[in-house]
């Protein structure tokens, strides 16, 4: 096996920043359990990184994504009813998207 060092990699981006992460577990009215980590960062134009910790699926989401048909179903592999309930929760926590120049 070839031993590689950091100089062998061509980094396109490499940065460190302070983030805020909210960990929340809840059960929807339809009895679907969600264990989420919702990370706020200076990246992603104000959108948040939402991770389903039970299944290891994540997406960068903002309020506009919640209005797009099929986004939550596709990313988190859930049905339409579960997606509607998740969207109702995420609407409360995602906040507005902030675009910069």
What do these predicted regions represent?
Residues 63-101:
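Mixed-charge, Lys/Arg-enriched low-complexity segments
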């Amino acid at each position: 096996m070839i031993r590689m060092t950091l100089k062998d990699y061509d980094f396109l981006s490499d940065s460190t920043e302070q983030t805020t992460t909210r960990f929340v577990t809840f059960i929807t009215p339809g009895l679907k359990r969600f264990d989420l980590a919702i990370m706020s960062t200076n990246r992603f134009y104000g959108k948040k990184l939402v991770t389903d910790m039970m299944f290891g699926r994540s997406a960068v989401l903002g309020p506009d994504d919640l209005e797009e048909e099929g986004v939550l179903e596709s990313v988190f592999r859930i049905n339409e009813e579960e997606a509607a309930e998740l969207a109702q929760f995420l609407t409360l926590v995602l906040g507005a998207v902030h675009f910069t120049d």
